């Protein structure tokens, strides 16, 4: 499996594109990035306001047979993403609104939507 980055000018949602790539059997692991989203969404189907100039991306990969429970990813993912952001913003303190929002100086900088998808009897996590 080779990790691939898929770049788009505009998509409905980066998660939607990742789901399509998985279900169409085109890719099992990768990252979808876009400059804009026309129908971004948050948890519980809430509308996500997608302002041009922000970063929109989804990472997807297959889960092994003995993967942790889905809700454990909700705890791990914000910490991993926070650590990645800190590589670029070393002097900023990131705070959390569990389970899926990250803030710097009280301003929301990131919302995390994770979805579990099954295709051809395999489970995939999209973040």
Where are these regions (language model features)?
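Short, intrinsically disordered, charge-balanced linker/junction segments flanking boundaries
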Residues: 125-127
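N-terminal lobe of the biotin/lipoate ligase/transferase fold
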Residues: 1-90, 110, 117
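Active-site beta-strand termini and strand-to-loop segments that position acidic
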Residues: 50, 104-105
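Catalytic/RNA-binding core of pseudouridine synthases
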Residues: 107, 118-123
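Surface-exposed, flexible loop/turn segments at secondary-structure boundaries
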Residues: 13, 102, 120
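Glycine- and Gly-Pro-enriched alpha-helical subdomains that act as flexible
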Residues: 96-98, 103-104, 113
């Amino acid at each position: 499996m080779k990790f691939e980055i898929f770049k788009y000018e505009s998509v409905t949602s980066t998660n939607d594109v990742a789901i399509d790539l998985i279900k169409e059997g085109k890719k099992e692991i990768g990252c979808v990035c876009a400059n804009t989203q026309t129908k971004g969404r948050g948890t519980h189907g809430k509308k996500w306001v997608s302002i041009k100039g922000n970063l929109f991306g989804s990472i997807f990969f297959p889960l092994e047979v003995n993967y942790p429970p889905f809700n454990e990813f909700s705890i791990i993912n914000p910490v991993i993403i926070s650590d990645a952001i800190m590589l670029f913003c070393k002097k900023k303190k990131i705070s959390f609104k569990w389970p899926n929002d990250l803030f710097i100086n009280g301003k929301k900088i990131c919302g995390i939507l994770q979805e579990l998808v099954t295709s051809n009897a395999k489970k995939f996590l999209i973040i």
